[in-house]
């Protein structure tokens, strides 16, 4: 089940990227961080905190600024990307649930194996297999499989094992920021003031949901303690 959810998330995000920009794809995918507490509420009866509700409102506002046009409609790419975000949220909750009982390395291997089988099955069913791959395709496949997927998740798991939760959440939330940065540099995406405001709202929503801005309160407490009497 966990592998199938990962397959659905990857597929929706990838197909969404065909009809939207990389920057919008990165930020709309990041909404899974905000959705996780509500998926936990629906499936595991763990009520969201007031910070989660605030993050949800901010995130909805950000999605509206990023995705909705003047007719309040959403294009296919943005809709598929949001669906991918929902699947990532379901996947994260499932991993948290089963990861408590299973070896994380084995669980990761099973996820990738199941996801790969689903991808192969769907490609055989709906795609025409080429006799030869285009020049440069092997390099792209190796980059996506090794660096963008396996190595990225491995470094994330290792980093989270030695980093406190709040700083780790902030660092992970920067994924969407780097997505926009590389989209501007490599893809030539134009970030309008409306898009920038939407990106900022989604980013703040992710940080609020993941950290409750606890790092700000700790910083203020340290300053107060260091102040002369």
PLM regions: where:
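Membrane-interface helix termini and inter-helical loops of multi-pass transporters
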Residues: 15-19, 64-76, 123-141, 184-193
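C-terminal transmembrane-helix exit sites in multi-pass transporters
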Residues: 32-54, 177-197
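Specific transmembrane alpha-helical segments of multi-pass solute transporters/efflux pumps
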Residues: 1-29, 65, 145-163
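Structural signature of hydrophobic alpha-helical transmembrane segments
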Residues: 14-32, 74-87, 135-146, 202
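Hydrophobic transmembrane alpha-helices of multi-pass small-molecule transport proteins
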Residues: 48-68, 84-88, 118-119, 173, ...
């Amino acid at each position: 089940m966990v592998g199938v959810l990962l397959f659905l998330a990857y597929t929706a995000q990838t197909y969404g990227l065909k009809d939207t920009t990389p920057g919008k794809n990165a930020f709309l995918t990041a909404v899974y961080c905000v959705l996780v507490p509500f998926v936990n509420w629906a499936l595991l009866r763990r009520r969201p905190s007031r910070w989660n509700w605030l993050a949800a409102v901010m995130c909805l506002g950000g999605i509206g600024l990023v995705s909705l046009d003047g007719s309040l409609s959403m294009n296919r790419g943005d809709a598929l990307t949001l669906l991918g975000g929902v699947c990532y949220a379901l996947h994260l909750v499932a991993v948290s649930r089963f990861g408590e009982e299973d070896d994380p390395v084995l669980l990761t291997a099973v996820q990738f194996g199941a996801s790969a089988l689903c991808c192969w099955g769907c490609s055989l069913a709906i795609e025409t297999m080429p006799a030869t791959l285009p020049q440069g395709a092997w390099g792209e496949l190796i980059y996506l499989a090794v660096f963008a997927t396996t190595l990225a998740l491995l470094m994330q798991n290792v980093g989270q094992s030695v980093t406190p939760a709040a700083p780790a959440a902030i660092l992970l939330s920067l994924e969407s920021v780097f997505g926009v940065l590389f989209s501007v540099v490599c893809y030539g995406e134009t970030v309008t003031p409306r898009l920038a405001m939407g990106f900022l709202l989604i980013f703040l929503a992710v940080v609020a949901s993941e950290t409750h801005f606890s790092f700000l309160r700790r910083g203020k407490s340290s300053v107060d303690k260091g102040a002369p009497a």
